[in-house]
Amino acid sequence: MAVDNLNVLRDGYQAFASGNMARLGELLADDIVWHTPGDNPLSGDYRGKDAVLTLFGRLFEETGGTFRADVHDLLANDDHGIGLVTVTARRGDRTLTVNDVNVFHLRDGKVAECWIASTDQQTEDKFWA
């Protein structure tokens, strides 16, 4: 592996957890595509680094800074990575706790594409509605 993609993912999750969007931006390809599933106001395909960072900002804004993605495990090879995470957040009187699988395509040491797969999309949709 020319670039240690496992460390790229680890650094990305640490930057996200600490709110370090500048560092996180360094780990995203300029032409990244981020696929957020579901039927809620945050669902959709986000194209470009600025769009993805704006999405991340909304996650924190909508939850009063309580949004977390706690990593259970990370796996990576030369081209792909997987993050097994538990997502937790609060929004008013609503709480969210759900397990997600984040599948990454990495290119030149940066995240080029990500697909989020929820184990309970209906619960996530209700939370973000």
Where are these regions (language model features)?
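Short beta-strand edge/turn micro-motifs at domain boundaries
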Residues: 103-125
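A solvent-exposed, acidic/Ser-Thr-rich amphipathic alpha-helical stretch
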Residues: 29-78
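Short, low-complexity N-terminal intrinsically disordered segments enriched in polar/charged residues
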Residues: 1-30, 125-129
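A short hydrophobic beta-strand element
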Residues: 78-87
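Short beta-strand segments enriched in hydrophobic/aromatic residues
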Residues: 28, 87-89, 118
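A short, polar/proline- and glycine-enriched secondary-structure boundary/capping micro-motif
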Residues: 45, 93-96, 122-128
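Ligand-binding pocket scaffold of soluble enzyme catalytic domains
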Residues: 16, 90-92, 113
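Hydrophobic/aromatic beta-strand elements that line small-molecule binding cavities or substrate pockets
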Residues: 69-74, 87-88, 99-105, 115
